[in-house]
């Protein structure tokens, strides 16, 4: 049973379904870039079997919190492992680095096999169940990626104007441009 970050909720919930309890640490409607875990959240991590976080710099607090835990049995997975990160992302404070919004392109979302594998490792008795659900999730992501590509391919103008420059991975996949205005 493990607390996880919002972006990482879909696959564990789909993979684990009735086999595990999946808890979201970051409350709905809260800005994840600024969120900090409470003492209760850290206590919950001490009792968790698995901790899944997005990575790529999204959760600035992860290293310090993980370093403070005494739970030596906690399986930790960074969901963005294996994804080529976009560099040159400028955050709200003007700092430039890797773009943490990797999940906003369906092709990246289906690369969450590392999440499925940690669930299999933490609960070997249900490993086949987790793998089958991951495979279904990957197919759904592939279908969504195809739908995006087909729907937008005929558009003459593929520029996307947003209030938060979070869609770079999706724009790369669709060969469009994103700009914060």
Model features per residue range: what roles?
Residues 1-181:
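Extracytoplasmic metal-acquisition and chelation regions
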């Amino acid at each position: 049973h493990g607390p996880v970050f919002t972006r990482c909720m879909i696959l564990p919930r789909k993979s684990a379904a009735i086999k595990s309890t999946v808890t979201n640490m970051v409350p709905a409607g809260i800005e994840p870039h600024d969120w900090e875990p409470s003492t209760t959240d850290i206590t919950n991590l001490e009792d968790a079997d698995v901790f899944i976080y997005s990575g790529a710099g999204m959760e600035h607090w992860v290293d310090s919190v993980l370093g403070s835990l005494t739970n030596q049995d906690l399986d930790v997975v960074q969901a963005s492992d294996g994804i080529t990160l976009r560099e040159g992302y400028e955050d709200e404070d003007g700092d430039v680095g890797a773009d943490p919004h990797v999940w906003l392109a369906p092709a990246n979302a289906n690369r969450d096999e590392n999440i499925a594998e940690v669930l299999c490792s933490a609960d070997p008795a249900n490993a086949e169940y987790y793998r089958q659900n991951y495979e279904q999730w990957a197919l759904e992501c592939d279908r969504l990626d195809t739908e995006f590509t087909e729907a937008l391919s005929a558009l003459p103008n593929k520029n996307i104007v947003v209030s938060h420059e979070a869609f770079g991975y999706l724009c790369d996949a669709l060969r469009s441009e994103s700009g914060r205005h």
